[in-house]
């Protein structure tokens, strides 16, 4: 199964960072041209994935602008706090590194809380903390698509292979996007790319956390997954990992397959 997963996610164990940066920027430039979109939008959390994805997006917009001087498109880097975020300074540091054409802060707190209150009024019970965490992620994507819709832009996703293999994202939340420039990269490769692009150690080494749970803020990805990124990256690079970790990862991959697919229909057989 390991070879199948590696092939399905398009992971390459060895990459040339400089060539890969150029390839991924060119990919975004080509897709902008193909779609006639007027820019790119990405939510910036301060984690390494959105930091690297954001910098690549800004580079792509600048390159497209050089080739098409009449083009009026931009890159919108969007901070999307739920009330007061404990890691707001990291998002600010990421924005300072990325230098997006437009730096926007759009507060999702009141909209998320309003939906939670409407949910309680309709169902007679409060949403669970886990459910509300996914609502936060989906509200952030609603906000990004609202900006993209206003300016005929594309929403950029920051999903990479270590998240894709585990399905560690909210379906139709942070898993929703028009273009995913980090696809096929391991977490280690994303960090290495960030270093090559000049991001600070603070941003590169930030402990990954979705930070969606109000009852357990800052819970790390690895704690929630029950797996380490070191083992996930090793597996995706074709290396052996402990049997228990391999079995858990492969079971998680199979269980989360629906997240990597379009909504299932009667003619689909992949789920059987």
Segments (PLM) and residue ranges:
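Alpha-helix boundary/capping residues
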Residues: 98, 118-122, 172, 197, ...
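Low-complexity, flexible helical/coil segments
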Residues: 112-118, 137-146, 188-199, 218, ...
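Repeat-unit-sized solenoid/scaffold elements
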Residues: 60, 109-127, 175-188, 222-243
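Peripheral terminal appendages
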Residues: 1-42, 48, 52-56, 216-272
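ATP-dependent adenylation/nucleotidyltransferase module used to activate substrates
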Residues: 2-166
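Catalytic subdomain that performs nucleotidyl-dependent activation
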Residues: 71-74, 100, 132, 158-226
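Residues on a specific face of well-ordered alpha-helices
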Residues: 55, 89, 93, 142, ...
């Amino acid at each position: 199964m390991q070879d199948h997963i590696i092939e399905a996610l398009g992971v390459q164990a060895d990459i040339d960072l400089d060539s890969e940066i150029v390839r991924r920027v060119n990919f975004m430039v080509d897709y902008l041209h193909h779609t006639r979109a007027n820019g790119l939008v990405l939510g910036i959390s301060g984690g390494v994935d959105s930091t690297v994805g954001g910098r690549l997006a800004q580079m792509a917009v600048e390159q497209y602008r050089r080739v098409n001087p009449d083009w009026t498109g931009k890159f919108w880097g969007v901070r999307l706090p739920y009330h007061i975020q404990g890691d707001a300074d990291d998002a600010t540091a990421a924005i300072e590194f990325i230098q997006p054409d437009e730096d926007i802060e759009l507060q999702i707190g009141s909209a998320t809380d309003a939906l939670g209150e409407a949910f309680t009024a309709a169902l007679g019970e409060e949403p669970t903390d886990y459910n509300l965490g996914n609502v936060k992620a989906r509200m952030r994507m609603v906000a990004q698509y609202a900006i993209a819709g206003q300016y005929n832009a594309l929403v950029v996703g920051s999903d990479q292979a270590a998240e894709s293999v585990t399905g560690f994202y909210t379906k139709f939340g942070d898993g929703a996007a028009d273009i995913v420039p980090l696809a096929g990269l391991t977490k280690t490769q994303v960090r290495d790319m960030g270093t090559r692009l000049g991001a600070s150690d603070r941003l590169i080494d930030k402990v990954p956390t979705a930070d969606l749970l109000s009852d357990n803020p800052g819970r790390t990805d690895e704690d929630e997954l029950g797996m380490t990124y070191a083992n996930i990256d090793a597996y995706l690079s074709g290396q052996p990992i402990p049997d228990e970790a391999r079995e858990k990862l492969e079971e998680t991959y199979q269980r989360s397959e629906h997240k990597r697919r379009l909504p299932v229909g009667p003619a689909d057989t992949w789920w059987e």
